[in-house]
Amino acid sequence: MSFNIAVAGKGGSGKTSVASLVIRYLLKNGSGPILAIDADPNANLGESLGLTVEQTVGLMLDAFQKDKINIPPGMNKQSYLDYKLNEIIIESKGLDLVTMGRGEGSECYCYPNLILKKFADSLAENYAYTVMDNEAGMEHLSRRTTQNVDGLFIISDHSVKGIRTVARIQGLVSDLKLVVKRQLVIINFVPTKLDPLVIEELDRLGIDSIATIPQDEEVYEYDLRLKSLLDLPDTSKAVRAVNDLMTNLFKTEGTHTKGGKNDSADY
């Protein structure tokens, strides 16, 4: 049974970087292969992982719609679609990536999301961990792309507006009765400590189960130079913070990883 983590948050919160560092932790400390899913039409998880993405679910569906009259003999429409979907999996050591992307000129992502979710569900049993980087905002929640997950990581930048977005995401999860075993709010880009105004807003909205990730010049430099965040050194401040929160998560869940306990995550 795959352990499923979904990463959500508003645009600019650094959710893709957090997803990449979660994957980095699992590669180093996990006990099995990882399926990474970039469910954001504005796909860039592959770049953060140092993987070249040439084909996506969106582009494949466009081609499939044009070519479905040429389904090979002995295959039906669904089996041919499954075959084409398997072609877009990018394989690397301990990690496979599937990217949703977008079709040519299509503005509606409901169908690609549905196909991606069904495909990911069918693949999950082959992986110890699944990490899904969702599109910015809350639309993926209303489409129920994000449910049946063990951990929902809601990412905010270090701002009052970001914290209010977190509250709206949590409210929508509750209203839609999505199946989420545990939620963790992660405040990214924290300078030295949480600003009193941010703390006040967290208290006002009743948001708890908090982890923080400090500003990290190394992450900025790696992104700037299109270097894989998987190659960040263990001394990176962001790496250490994500390692801590992941270790604490698995300790709470009673889930086995190879890693030891760290103590700098702020809950």
Predicted regions mapped to residue ranges:
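Residue-level preference for the first positions of well-ordered beta-strands
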Residues: 4-6, 33-35, 95-97, 129-131, ...
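Walker A/P-loop phosphate-binding motif and the immediately C-terminal alpha-helix
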Residues: 3-41
